[in-house]
Regions:
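Active-site neighborhood of divalent metal-dependent phosphoester bond hydrolases
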Residues: 45-48, 53-134
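N-terminal active-site segment of His-dependent metallophosphoesterases
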Residues: 1-50
Length: 134
């Protein structure tokens, strides 16, 4: 029965899997993931898919990058109510994203998708409803 802590995955899925293989996590072990799952790395989509399917012995905490990501999605949700969008349409998701980027350019105080994680996920095929599931 071991306890492990990892953090700052930042979209580095391959490295995450190598770490998990190295510790050989068993059902009796506890793994605490201390946040910052997304941004910077090349495989944010894969890391998010892993998060959505973790076993019960894995505790997930949000980091500042995850909070920023969640705020980006919430901002998109607010704007989406003003638009006639199909949340399951990739094209409508791209339209919503472009609208958000335009809004952010108009107001320097608005920070939206600075690391382009949302953009990467949309380009990987994530629709707005799938983004909201996270």
């Amino acid at each position: 029965m071991g306890s492990y802590v990892i953090s700052d995955i930042h979209g580095c899925y391959d490295e995450l899997i190598r770490m998990l293989e190295k510790i050989n996590l068993e059902d009796s072990d506890t793994l605490i993931c201390a946040g910052d799952y997304v941004d910077k790395g090349p495989k944010n989509a894969e890391v998010l898919e892993w998060i959505m399917n973790v076993p019960p012995n894995v505790i997930l905490l949000r980091g500042n990058h995850d909070e920023d990501f969640a705020q980006n999605i919430e901002a998109m949700r607010i704007i989406s109510y003003k638009m006639d969008l199909d949340r399951d349409s990739l094209q409508d998701t791209k339209t919503l994203y472009r609208s958000m980027k335009k809004l952010a350019k108009k107001d320097a105080s608005v920070k939206f998708d600075r690391c382009e994680t949302v953009y990467e996920l949309i380009e990987s095929g994530y629709t707005f409803s799938r983004l909201c599931a996270w």
